[in-house]
From Swiss-Prot:
Keywords: Aromatic hydrocarbons catabolism, Lyase. The lineage of its organism: Bacteria, Pseudomonadati, Pseudomonadota, Betaproteobacteria, Rhodocyclales. Its EC number is 4.1.2.44. This is Benzoyl-CoA-dihydrodiol lyase. Catalyzes the ring opening of 2,3-epoxy-2,3-dihydroxybenzoyl-CoA to form 3,4-didehydroadipyl-CoA semialdehyde. It comes from the Bacteria.
């Protein structure tokens, strides 16, 4: 096999890894405390052409971080606090590698920043929902994306050695923004006063010592002699706020099994078949034939083979591969296959056992995977036909779609279904359930939908409740769907990306929507501007000894 949907295999990014393959991170556990140590291999870049100096990172480093976090969640339920620190002297992390950014295409930079944002959002997600706390032990200079990683943690402790500082130097040094949530977390999360934030984000040297604490940029500054002892004490204190189980046995995350061929990516419960000429992919999620685990003990015994977790891992991998490796595949056709009642029964099992640590972590995996769909810059059409199983958890996929078409078949039964999972278990990045977001939290339509929880609904019933966009009959189905797909595929992908991002998240703002919808949007615009990436732009000239030449006109 030479290519997947015209994409050379050698150019494909693989998001699967495991600790034995790590080149940059190490994970150690000691009872309720885990330590993630960043010690980057300078020659271990995911692409050639740059060295990862000063503990700077690229996509490959973050793929390892994402994997390590998953292993803490599932393999180490006894861990309550994760200490994030550096294995290099006097440097915590200097952020994204500047030379990598300078060499990268616009699309690579955008996808890189999106994935790193999702990984840091996932840190906060685990703290909020799973009781897994994070402590940034900044044992050296903490700059740019390094500080953004620290910002995602529950607490930040900076060593007071008269040299180490925290900084966001992107504006003065590179002519770009801190693109992994830095600006937003400084204001929304750390509550740094605006004038202090303005100074902090426009000086390259950063802020150190007591001033960093006074400005709320860190929680503590500690002398080097007391640093290790202080970190241990704070890690234990954070652990006391967690309810993760001390005696639970973890579930080993084995390598995800899949087949890759010229048509796409194929898993046991997920399939992504690409139509390269039509620039579309059919993304299908399959339900199991029956419910095979009902109690917490039975669920834990199944481990990674428990359908909700296995399906979520497969879907997550498919999404990441499509987003990174197939930029021109702009329309995702979302389908399901299976018995809708089986999905509702599995949801009932999830709901009954949601206090179990493993079920809770699986819910978290599903929540983050579904959120990944929401923020993907692709058009999403759900196609609901007889034999599909858009019910409960899988109905969330249809609710994430920009449009949903449901065949009103004359003979075959075609249904969608609602479960407890549809009413707050899987909030979007704006904090709302997809039902609440769909109806702008209006009480009457939300109540009408909630009254049908546990029911399987016909096309007419789904249409009346506002759960689907259209219900063509047998005569019109093929033509209406074909026209909708062809019309969408003919529109400007840039305009569609902006359109979809504006329409999907409704009137409610959160820190995460501001990161994706404001910070990322401005960063992506700046990434295209000559002041950053032109021949004389700051990002292009970084490290050359030459001074950037700016176009001084404000736009």
């Amino acid at each position: 096999m030479q290519a997947v949907a015209n994409k050379p295999v050698a150019e494909l990014v693989d998001y699967r890894t495991e600790p034995s393959k790590y080149r940059h991170w190490s994970l150690a556990t000691d009872g309720e405390i885990a330590t993630l140590t960043l010690n980057i291999d300078e020659d271990g870049g995911i692409r050639p052409g740059y060295k990862l100096k000063l503990n700077s990172y690229d996509l490959g480093v973050d793929i390892e971080l994402h994997d390590a976090l998953q292993r803490v969640r599932f393999e180490h339920p006894e861990v309550r606090t994760v200490v994030v620190t550096s294995g290099k002297p006097k440097i915590f992390c200097s952020g994204a590698n500047i030379y990598m950014l300078g060499l990268s295409t616009h699309a690579w930079k955008v996808n890189f920043c999106k994935f790193t944002n999702e990984t840091r959002n996932g840190i906060e997600d685990s703290s909020q929902y799973s009781g897994l706390k994070f402590l940034a032990a900044c044992n050296g200079t903490t700059a740019g994306g390094g500080y953004e990683l620290a910002l995602a943690c529950d607490e930040i402790v900076l060593v007071d050695d008269r040299n180490s500082s925290v900084s966001l130097p992107e504006v003065p040094l590179l002519g770009v923004l801190p693109g992994t949530g830095g600006l937003t977390r400084v204001t929304d999360k750390r509550r740094v006063r605006r004038d202090h934030a303005d100074i902090f984000c426009t000086i390259s040297e950063g802020v150190r010592g007591q001033r960093a604490k006074d400005w709320r940029l860190v929680d503590d500054v500690v002398k080097q002699q007391q640093f290790a002892e202080h970190i241990q004490a704070r890690a234990k204190a954070l652990a006391q706020t967690s309810d993760r189980p001390a005696g639970a046995k973890g579930v080993k995350l084995t390598t995800l099994e899949r087949t890759v061929d010229e048509k796409g990516y194929h898993y046991e419960f997920v399939d992504a078949t690409i139509d390269a000429d039509g620039r579309t992919v059919t993304l299908t999620v399959r339900a199991p034939a029956a419910v095979t685990a009902k109690t917490a003990a039975e669920i834990e015994a199944q481990g990674i083979k428990w359908w909700p977790l296995q399906m979520a891992r497969e879907l997550d991998d498919a999404i990441l591969n499509l987003r990174t490796n197939h930029l021109d595949v702009g329309l995702w056709q979302l389908r399901t296959e299976g018995d809708a009642q089986v999905v509702l029964d599995i949801d009932a099992t999830i709901d009954a056992n949601r206090d179990n640590w493993f079920v809770r972590e699986t819910i978290g995996m599903l929540r983050r995977t579904l959120a990944r769909i929401d923020v993907s810059s692709r058009s999403l059409y759900a196609l609901i036909e007889p034999g599909s199983c858009f019910a409960g958890t899988l109905l969330e996929i249809a609710l994430a779609a920009d449009r949903s078409y449901m065949l009103d078949a004359a003979e075959a039964k075609n249904v969608v279904g609602l479960s407890a999972m549809n009413f707050g278990t899987f909030p979007m990045v704006n904090g709302l359930s997809r039902i609440d977001a769909r109806f702008y939290q209006e009480e009457a339509p939300v109540a009408a939908v909630k009254a049908k929880q546990g029911s399987l609904l016909s096309p007419a019933e789904a249409m009346e409740l506002g759960l689907v966009t259209a219900i063509p009959d047998d005569l019109d189905w093929a033509e209406e769907v074909r026209i909708a797909i062809e019309e969408r595929a003919a529109l400007s992908p840039d305009a569609l990306t902006g359109l979809e991002a504006n329409l999907r998240f409704g009137p409610v703002e959160t820190m995460n929507t501001r990161i994706f919808g404001r910070l990322s949007a401005w960063q992506n615009w700046i990434f295209n501007r000559p002041n950053a990436v032109g021949e004389n732009g700051a990002l292009k000239l970084f490290g050359s000894g030459k001074k950037a030449q700016f176009d001084w006109n404000r736009v």
